[in-house]
Amino acid sequence: MAQGRDGGNPFAEPGELDNPFQDPAVIQHRPSTHYATLDVYNPFETREPPPSYEPPAPVPIAPPSAPPLQSSRKLSPTEPKNYGSYSTQASTAAATAELLKKQEELNRKAEELDRRERELQHAALGSTATRQNNWPPLPSFCPVQPCFFQDISMEIPQEFQKTVSTMYYLWMCSTLALLLNFLACLASFCVETSNGSGFGLSILWILLFTPCSFVCWYRPMYKAFRSDSSSNFFVFFFIFFVQDVLFVLQAIGIPGWGFSGWISALVVLKVNTAVAVLMLLVALFFTGIAVLGIVMLKRIHSLYRRTGASFQKAQQEFAAGVFSNPAVRTAAANAAAGAAENAFRAP
């Protein structure tokens, strides 16, 4: 029987033959550990280590856009905003500076045009009809009226206005120096009675030089620059050269001449120190005026050379001025008529 169960295998072991579950037919239909079905699957049956846990790859998340930084300092309403680069700002600043420069030039040209327009209007209406004398500036109740009309900004070309103004200030300084010289000579006469002649001459100089210097050298210079007159330039050069010599003599201060110069001040220093100091200040003032007078004479001469004036032009202007004078023409006509009548009466 055993032989019949094992299929006639005499070499089979007795245990295996007695185990009914070792039947090949049964083993064939037993579930395998490698191919387990769902109903017989036991998760605790395997002894292999569980696979390591692999987390899913993280999906990259775009960082949130940061809000634009705002300056903690608020711009004032008048403060310009920075809309461009440095080069743009530099070019804008250069353009602005150029525009300002052109605007200033246009303003100067407009002022010059206004001045010329006023000159043309005065010339068209007539100088005597519209221009009233305004110098010297006397009060209205004074019985003496102004003798000259003077307006440097209107009558003198712009390039010569500074020179004419400087000469006007020089004349004013010379007048002030003569007044201080009179006071110094008065003080000197008070401390030293022998200086009476100098005190008397100081009064004469202030009364003589003040009006004569204005009429003899300042007015010719003013008219020369106003109308580009060569004859007035020559009159000015001759008289102002003499005036410069007088300025030097005033600064030297020869005793008895009525000038409180350096020599007179040093002489009085032995008598009274306070009066000598006053005379030294006047001498210093005279010295400054003399230096400025020499400098201005050279400067005006250089301007005269650049204007194209000449001695021949001065002669022509002088001749034209003489023959255009009605009094001169009347005198010349009378002289010619008298000479002709005498010639016909001669035997």
Swiss-Prot record:
Gene Ontology CC entries for this record: recycling endosome membrane; trans-Golgi network membrane
Alphabetized UniProt keyword annotations: Isopeptide bond, Membrane, Phosphoprotein, Protein transport, Transmembrane, Transmembrane helix, Transport, Ubl conjugation
Cytoplasmic side: 1-170, 298-347
Highest taxon in the source lineage: Eukaryota
Keyword hit for Phosphoprotein: yes
Membrane topology: Multi-pass membrane protein
Protein name per Swiss-Prot or TrEMBL: Secretory carrier-associated membrane protein 3
Organism: Bos taurus
